[in-house]
UniProtKB/Swiss-Prot annotation:
Protein's organism: Streptococcus agalactiae serotype III (strain NEM316)
Known EC number: 6.1.1.12
GO cellular component: cytoplasm
Lineage, broadest ranks: Bacteria, Bacillati, Bacillota, Bacilli, Lactobacillales
Gene that encodes the chain: aspS
Keyword Ligase (UniProt): yes
Protein name in the entry: Aspartate--tRNA ligase
Length: 583
């Protein structure tokens, strides 16, 4: 029989209609001789009623055999419920069954198919096809589909061209580790799965495409966390002949449309703009969460004369004030915060409490002479907790930024109904890597330096600024972009500043440098992390909730057991040997 409609879409206007439904048995209940079944499909749940006085004995026998997650086909008449269930969209109606057949049976599932299950993550991923049956998960992917549909409509209307770029490409340095794919035809050579379509989309601008976009898979072999996966999806854009402001305007319009189409929200345009240095100094993060206050305060000048060497001899002394929560933090609680501070490179965490117009705490005796200035500078009020870090500017900012976010979550200071977008601009071109002992690209080596600082490519690299911009949402980097280098000499200077010899630059990026000999237009773009965006729209804290078949924290798939060993024959065909199969 042909399905008439989705079970979750049956409403009171269908009363008296004969329909056929197909789906899964959510649960079965036997009450007073009647059998009640919750039939579930992707749109929701519909109650079925089987009355032994109104159906054939075979139908009743089939109903009695049903168990959770059996797949069934059922026909009957929609009737009004005697008692409506206000918790269900279908709660005013039920289906009086006339015909019933089993399309497939099911073993007992390892967890219940319902929201709010307590199964651990690996069990959910091992049986991902069952996990995805849960209404909550289905809603996540409906939302994701709405987001991509909205984005495509918006960009199509602006005459962007959707172009697929290669999945098998060249391995290049800078950034995360590549996933490598050995070539059978070209023995000893390897492709790389793209970390982004960065260079190919730039080449499309040189080809005259003018406006490109792609919703594209990318791959990075990096350590995983809640908002990272080894394979992820980007909304990738590139344009020619536009300024950074014009590109940002396009992106803002796209996000505004997505918010309207998916959440019914009007977002205020233009988005706020914040300089990178201000973000770091005030929020301790290059992706500031502006849904709550607790800004970092610089106290270096105030404390430099105190008789406390930890403060007086430090490069900087900065603090955050936790308003009206001093009584919530015992010494044990503060010790936990101190351990977190040490994880970010701080030597420790000094603290004070301000109660009844008096400071108290381990360092209070050193600060009595400046208590008035401190109280005024920090605008202290009763029951405030003050946390200090005395260290380099970078360590103080990063440590207090991390504590600021953790404390806000602990104390429930964040308004989760808000969607606070902003641009972080005026980025440094380079960042120093202690591990590498050299400057690295803060974004990537194709970013255009500002005209005012480009001369420092041969001088002080710390002074070079980039025409770069990150879009931030609620403390997460949603995406990043920049204007790109289109002049060959500037690109060669950039490679040299990053430590490339002329030979290595030619070996790695010769095709790009050659393209710059052929009228490369001014261009720029941006990429937005689709998984992260949908995660935030769905109110989740892990992108696994919005990726159909994600990897776990070991970059493995418990369902398919990927990655897996391969046969000796496959290795021989690729001229590869593996030293050990041991984990």
């Amino acid at each position: 029989m042909k399905r008439s409609m989705y079970a979750g879409r049956v409403r009171s206007e269908h009363i008296g209609t004969s329909i056929t439904l197909k789906g899964w048995v959510g649960r079965r209940r036997d009450l007073g001789g009647l059998i009640f079944i919750d039939l579930r499909d992707r749109e929701g749940i519909m109650q079925l009623v089987i009355n032994p006085e109104e159906v054939a004995a075979s139908v009743m026998a089939t109903a009695e055999s049903l168990r959770s997650e059996f797949v069934i086909e059922v026909s009957g008449v929609v009737t009004a419920r005697e008692q409506a269930n206000d918790n269900l969209p279908t709660g005013e109606v039920e289906l009086k069954v006339q015909e019933l057949s089993v399309l497939n049976t099911s073993k007992t599932t390892p967890f219940e198919i319902k929201d709010g299950i307590e199964a651990n993550d690996d069990t959910r991923m091992r049986y991902r096809y069952l996990d995805l049956r849960r209404p909550e998960m289905l809603e996540n992917f409906k939302l994701r589909a709405k987001v991509t549909h909205s984005i495509r409509n918006y960009l199509d209307n602006l005459e962007f061209i959707d172009v697929e770029t290669p999945m098998l490409t060249k391995s290049t340095p800078e950034g995360a580790r590549d996933y490598l794919v050995p070539s059978r035809v070209n023995q000893g050579h390897f492709y790389a799965l793209p970390q982004s379509p960065q260079i190919t989309k730039q080449l499309l601008m040189n080809a005259g495409f003018d406006r490109y976009y792609q919703i594209v898979k990318c791959f990075r072999d990096e350590d995983l966390r809640g908002d990272r996966q080894p394979e992820f999806t980007q909304v990738d854009l590139e344009t020619s002949f536009l300024s950074d402001q014009e590109i940002q305007d396009i992106v803002e319009g796209m996000i505004a449309k997505v918010m309207k189409d998916t959440k019914g929200l009007e977002v205020s345009l233009p988005f706020p703009r914040m300089a990178y240095d201000d973000a770091m100094n005030n929020y301790g993060s290059d992706k500031p969460d502006t849904r709550f206050d607790m800004l970092l305060q610089d106290l270096t000048e105030i404390v430099k004369e105190v008789d406390f060497k930890v403060f007086s001899e430090a490069s900087v002394v900065k603090a955050i004030v936790v308003k009206d929560k001093a009584d919530k933090y015992s010494r044990k609680n503060i010790d936990k915060l101190t351990e977190i501070a040490k994880q970010y490179g701080a030597k420790g965490l000094a603290w004070l409490k301000y109660v009844d117009n008096t400071i108290s705490g381990p360092v209070a005796k050193f600060l009595t002479a400046i208590e008035g200035r401190l109280t005024e500078a920090l605008q202290l009020e009763n029951n405030d907790l003050i946390l200090f870090v005395a260290d380099s500017l970078e360590v103080a900012n990063e440590t207090l930024g991390a504590l600021r976010t953790r404390i806000a979550k602990e104390l429930e200071l964040i308004d989760y109904s808000k969607f606070n977008f902003l641009w972080v601009v005026d980025w440094p071109m380079f960042e120093w890597s202690e591990e590498e002992g050299r400057y690295m690209s803060a974004h990537h080596p194709f970013t255009l330096p500002t005209a005012e600082t480009a001369h420092e490519l041969e001088g002080d690299l710390a002074k070079v600024r980039a025409v770069a911009y990150d879009i931030v949402l609620n403390g997460y980097e949603l995406g990043g972009g920049s204007l790109r280098i289109n002049q060959k000499d500037t690109q060669e200077r950039m490679f040299k500043a990053l430590g490339f010899s002329a030979e290595s630059a030619q070996e790695q990026f010769g095709f790009l440098l050659e393209a710059m000999d052929y009228g490369f237009p001014p261009h720029g773009g941006l990429a937005i992390g689709l998984d992260r965006f949908v995660m935030l729209l769905a109110g989740k804290d892990n992108i696994r909730e919005v990726i159909a078949f994600p990897k776990n924290n070991k970059a493995s798939d418990p369902m398919t057991q990927a990655p897996s060993l391969v046969s000796e024959q496959q290795l021989e065909e690729l001229s590869l040997t593996v030293e050990s199969y041991e984990n």
